[in-house]
Amino acid sequence: MKKIKSFGGKSLGGGKQEKLLKDFMKMQEELQKKMQEMEESFSEMEVEASVGGGAVRIVATCDRRVKEIEIDEDLKEDLETLKDLLAAAVNEIMEKIEKRREEEMSKITQQFGIPGLM
């Protein structure tokens, strides 16, 4: 088998190269499996955002699905305030979802020695 130079300039014999490739493929498969499991778990992970002192509250899952919206009865009379608070709550929930997803992704990438992937 032909020797191939690695990135460090050293020659890798055929056996070493094959083992490295097999190890890499196995790690890639494990990483893909973990990532798929994580994606599936996002439908169960909930985050909550509350704005206006609790006047508007949103609960959503980390797969970006809104489960619940609560609006204080007093906001019925003030449509402009309601729209502002609703926009703020949606923005906050999206930020929280992304942060949670990044935290979960970081847990997996650290297991595989891939810091800063997300």
Swiss-Prot record:
InterPro entries in UniProt: YbaB-like_sf, YbaB/EbfC
Main subcellular location: cytoplasm
Keyword annotations of the record: Cytoplasm, DNA-binding
An example molecular function term from Gene Ontology annotations: DNA binding
**GO CC, any one term:** bacterial nucleoid
Pfam families with a match to the protein in the record? YbaB_DNA_bd (PF02575)
Tell me where in or outside the cell this protein is found. Answer: Cytoplasm, Nucleoid
State the PANTHER family in the record. Answer: NUCLEOID-ASSOCIATED PROTEIN YBAB
Family of this protein? Belongs to the YbaB/EbfC family.
The protein's role, per its UniProt record = Binds to DNA and alters its conformation. May be involved in regulation of gene expression, nucleoid organization and DNA protection.
Q: Subunit structure of this entry?
A: Homodimer.
Quote the protein name from its UniProt record: Nucleoid-associated protein CTN_1899
* Organism, as annotated: Thermotoga neapolitana (strain ATCC 49049 / DSM 4359 / NBRC 107923 / NS-E)
